Amino acid sequence: MPQHRRIHVTPVWLLIGRRSLGIVICTLSIATFVFGLAGFVWQYGSTNSVPSGSPAGGAVEPEPRQDWTIPVFKAVQLFLLNSGAEDDQGHPSNWLLMIARIAAGLLFLVVSSAVILRILDDVRRLPGVLTRRDHVVICGLGQIGLQLLDDLKNQGRVRDVVIVENNPANPWLQYAENMGAEVLIGDSTRADTLAEARVSKAAEVFVVNGDDGVNLEVVAELGNRLQNLKPSQRQTPLRVHVHIVDTNFATALRPYCSVLHDSPNMSVQVFNVLRNAAAELVTHQLWPFAPKQESEVAHFVILGFGAMGQAMAVQLAQIGSFPNLQRNRFTIADHDIKKSASPFLARYPRFTSWMDDNSGQLGVASFSPQADQWDWNKEPLPQEIKVDAPDAIQYACNAEFVELPEGRSDERFAAKLAKQFTGDGIKPIVFVCGRQDRDNFELAVQLRDQLSCQGCADVPIFVWLPRQPALAETLSRAAKEKIIPFGQCHTAAAYQEITDPLRERIGQKIQEAYEEREAEAASLKGQEYSRKKWADIPDGFRESNRVAADHMLIKLRRVGVEIVRRTTPEQKGGRFTKKFREDTRRTLAKMEHYRWVAERLLAGWRYIPKGTSDAEISEYKRRRFNHNITVFEKSEAEKDFDQIDVIYEECQKLDGFILRRASDTE
């Protein structure tokens, strides 16, 4: 996977001028004052007319007191282009004063030239600022802002970009200017800064400052600014994409996007790069190593359980439903694992089997083939959340939480992993998700060496390298090493991934197909059915469709097909029939069912026998109960087959995307 390199080239004359301007001004200022002070002291010290503090009016002092502050005052006057000297017979000039006057003149020329050039530059840009519209505003020039800038440059839209950055020392400001973007130095939470960026006339705003609180303040200020616009002043709502760094906060905030502001003239979408990176890995990079036979089981090892590790665990549990049709195994390790695992289990109590008995045991004590089966229902859960029903699926996966040794090359830890990997049908995959790129790289390399010594040289190791494209490119070139980078901004924070995500498009198609089936069923009964629009569906159900869309990519890989963005208008995809062999169709339906079960469990849903009336079923849904959270054979499988039957049909309707035969077809 080639990485994108940014070449930051500044013209030599500009580089020298900008770096030396401050030095020149400082040097001339010092020279003016020092030589001027010395010259005036020399001038008055060499004459009999030394300034004094003797009183006026004829009062006589035997010995007048010499006032040496006068030379200081005269030296300061040089900065105002006032020579301050009395060049006559009584006060002869000297070479020190000549140097000081020359330095003062040069200082005036340098400073005034810089000011005039800045004013001329502002005047030059003023017509463009006053007429700018339908442009893109990027608040924050960090990793995400840079990626957006690069993507817009590739689309030929970079001159329609305005960067708002509050740090004048940001090393990428010159890069942005060289690309042709407009750069504003200012606080994006302030109304005057947003006014200068003309956000009221913009097409899109990306709020990527790197601080969740600041980003929300920007959204609120945008709402205030657009609230009182007349309909004639804006034809379409301003599209605002706000990055929320905290994955859990982003999930909680997403349903409230419509109430983050009071303006009908803007729409807000929340995105999270960590979630994007984890989903990208599971749906695009994991398939070659995934379990594909029913005799196989995935054993995922997550090293580092911070924000990225937790996002990875959630995505693997939600959409890691493969053709093996088994629960996934997890070994999750970090320093002081209880500190991060306990809040995670509190948020996702049905992620795995566990007990809150103060024993210190988190997750499962061991792995067994019986517990890999979805019908296994004997592992414990806290009594308060356990469902007392033999048909219920209680939790999504089997996970153990262990301490990560301080030493990265701990042989005992590698030996323990190797022992777990050597069982029949085990498909181990390691994810290194620490907080620092360099530490992740070192841990991945050292663990690879340790596992090789334990006879597990073929274990793939995915390493999170979001900030070091050079390291990621190095690993990409060494594909035989089975150390694979992920999480780079050119995929997780790409412009199209944020503004037009595939999961949103497929999710809408899934919902439309569902509404079509419901309308047909109602018509057969002689009833009317009011179809719901995508925007009117509760966010929880919209997100469920999005997760189903994520998994659609894995189902397509199961039948040897992949969906990709169309890069040119002439690019053609294959045409695929919607008919599957019955055994393939059943496998895909089972994959969808257990994917749906895991997603529902993580969202807090529980099993309950089917309601006997519409009112009871509606009440169960409100309380997050569902009778289908059970094994495939005991569920209403029609819903799963319905979704499978529209895979090709719906995916081939997507504008801007094509289906094609995957390179690793079965």
Language-model features, listed with the residues they occupy:
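Amphipathic alpha-helical binding modules
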Residues: S618-G656
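Short, charge- and proline-biased low-complexity linear segments
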Residues: I537, A548-R557, G611-E619, V646-E650
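C-terminal accessory/binding modules appended to enzymatic or scaffolding proteins
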Residues: R586-R622
